[in-house]
From Swiss-Prot:
Family: Belongs to the class-II aminoacyl-tRNA synthetase family.
Residues spanning the membrane: none
Keywords: Aminoacyl-tRNA synthetase, ATP-binding, Cytoplasm, Ligase, Metal-binding, Nucleotide-binding, Protein biosynthesis, RNA-binding, tRNA-binding, Zinc
Domain TGS: 1-64
Name of protein: Threonine--tRNA ligase
Gene name, Swiss-Prot/TrEMBL: thrS
Amino acid sequence: MSQAISLTFPDGSVRGYDAGATGRDVAESISKSLAKKAVAVAIDGTVRDLSDPVTTGRIEIITRNDDRALELIRHDAAHVMAEAVQELWPGTQVTIGPVIENGFYYDFAKNEPFTLDDLPKIEKKMKEIIARNAAFTKQVWSRDRAKQVFADKGEQYKVELVDAIPEGQDLKIYYQGDWFDLCRGPHMASTGQIGSAFKLLKVAGAYWRGDSNNPMLSRIYGTAFAEQSELDNYLHMLAEAEKRDHRRLGREMDLFHFQEEGPGVVFWHGKGWRVFQTLVAYMRRRLAGDYQEVNAPQVLDKSLWETSGHWGWYRDSMFKVTVAGDDTDDDRVFALKPMNCPGHIQIFKHGLKSYRELPIRLAEFGNVHRYEPSGALHGLMRVRGFTQDDAHIFCTDEQMAAECLKINDLILSVYKDFGFDEVTIKLSTRPDKRVGSDELWDRAESVMMGVLETIQQQSNNIKTGILPGEGAFYGPKFEYTLKDAIGREWQCGTTQVDFNLPERFGAFYIDSNSEKTQPVMIHRAICGSMERFLGILIENFAGHMPLWVSPLQVVVATITSEADAYGLEVAEALREAGLNVETDFRNEKINYKIREHSVTKVPVIIVCGRKEAEERTVNIRRLGSQDQVSMGLDAAVESLALEATPPDIRRKAEARKAKAA
C-alpha cells in the first residue's frame, strides 16, 4: 500500500503511514513499550480510539499519565459500573452515564432505588470486570437495528435515546466483552486500563431528562483517578469539605436558615446579617471614589426584558409578576430582575453624556432572582434570590484596555484581602452563536488578550488560560477562579465586554466630533453572588473567620461572679474600640463555656477571674488553641482592635502614617 497519510508528531517530526493505519499501529511503530502504555490518540487535538484509522494531521499518543486520559478513565469506569449493576440486578435498565467534574454518574431504572449498602457490592463486581481486561470494541449500527436490539432487551430508555440522535449521525455501540452500550466514545483499549483507583460515592434520585413529569431514576455517583494517591487525596478533600459544609456551620454559628415556604431564599439571622453587611461595607469602601453606587428597580415591565433579549434568551429562569387582585387597572406582565444590566443602561441613558464624562462606572448591590430547579438548590451556593456586587462601566473603545486592567487590579486585591492567593484568570473567546460583527470581536479579543499578557507580566503567581468558544453571545469575558484551603476551585469574578445591550437600548454618548457614538459596556462582578461568596468564605475558613469578618468577635467569660463587674468593664472597653462583644456570666464551669463558644466559632474568648480583676489583666484564648495568653487590659484592647480592623482601612492608616513621617 502507498503511504497515503502524513502525521506530525509533538517533536515536529513527520512520518508517513499507509491508509487504514490505526492509532495502535502508529504507537507500535514508535516502540512496543509506548504501545503498551497507550490508551488513546489525539488527531489535531480530538481524542479518538486507538483502534480508529488515523488521518493526516497532528498526532499525540495519549497514555494514562496524560491529563486527557482522566476523562477516559472515568468514562470507562461508568460503563463498567453499568455492566456491574446489570450483572447484579438483571432487568435494571441503564439510561445515561456522563463524565462530570471530579467523577461520573449513571442513571438506572430499577424497581427499588439503590442504597449506600449496595455500593460495596457494585465496587466488588467492577473489580472483577476490570480484571477480565475485556477489549473495548466499536460497531456502527443502523437506527432500526439499534432500536430493535434495545427493545428486545427491554431497554426502553435506550430506544428513546436512539430516536433522539439526529438523522445522518452514526449510532456507535461499544462492547466490553459481551456487554454493550450506546455511546459516542471514545474509550480506552480495554477495561484493565481503568485500574483500581475508583470509588462509588453516593446515590440519589434523578428525573429522566431532568423533567419532573418523567419517571424518577436511581443515580449512582462515582469517581476515578489514574493513581491511588490521587484518589486518596480527593477522598480526603471530600471528608474535609463535609466538615466545612457551610449549611451545617451556618446552623451551628446561628447565621441563617432555609425553609420550605421560601425555597432558595435566605433567612438571615442577626449574626449572619452582620457578616453579610460587613462584606457589603468592605466592598463599598473598595468602590468609593471610582464608582457611583446606584439602585435599579427589582420589578420591571416585560417589554424592557424583551428589548434586552432576556425574555427570549432567559425567560425560563425568570420570575413573572402580575397584580394579584382581580379589580386592577394594570394588567401588564412584569418580571423580577435576574440581572442588573438593563437597569444600569436606563440610568446611563438618562441625560446626555459627553466623551469627557467617560468612563462612567455604575455599581449596585442588586437583589436579583433566578429560577433554579429545586433539586439544584444548595444552601448559599445555589439560590433563587441573591445579591450581585454588579457594576457596569461605560467607556470609549480606547479606554477598554485600561478599564479591564483596573478591574483586574481591584478583583485580585479583594481576593487577597480574604486570603485567596491562588487565582486563575481565563479568557473566553467568541462562541459560534453570537451578536456583533467579526471586526468588533477581533478588536475586543485583541484588547483582552493584551490585558491578559499584561496581567501575566505583572503577577507571577497568577495562572492564565484561554477558553475557546466559551464567551458570552454578546462579547468575550475574563473568568476569575479561586482555589480554597482544601484545593477546591470556585469561579467567582467576571469581566465581560458587551456589544449587544448598548445597541439594543440605543445607548450613546457625544464624541469629540459631536457625533453620537455607542459606548463600550463592560460588565464586572467581583464576588458574583454575595451569598455564594460568603458560603465560600465559611467553608474556606471552616467557620473560623478572620477577626474582622467574624460576626461575634469576642466573648468575655468570667470564672466567678466576683469578676462579673470587671468583665463588664472589659467588654465595654472592647466595644468602645469597635469590636462585637458578648458576655457570658452564667454560673457554669469555664471549660463548659469555652467548649460551647468554640462550637459557634467565636474567634476570641477572654477569660476573667478574681486574679485578673485585681491585676487588671485578661487571659486571651483563641479558637482552636489550648493556650491562653495573659495581657494587660489596655494592651489587649489595642491588639484586638488592630486585628479587627479591615485590611483596606489598615492600609489607608499605614499610608497616612508613612506620608506624615
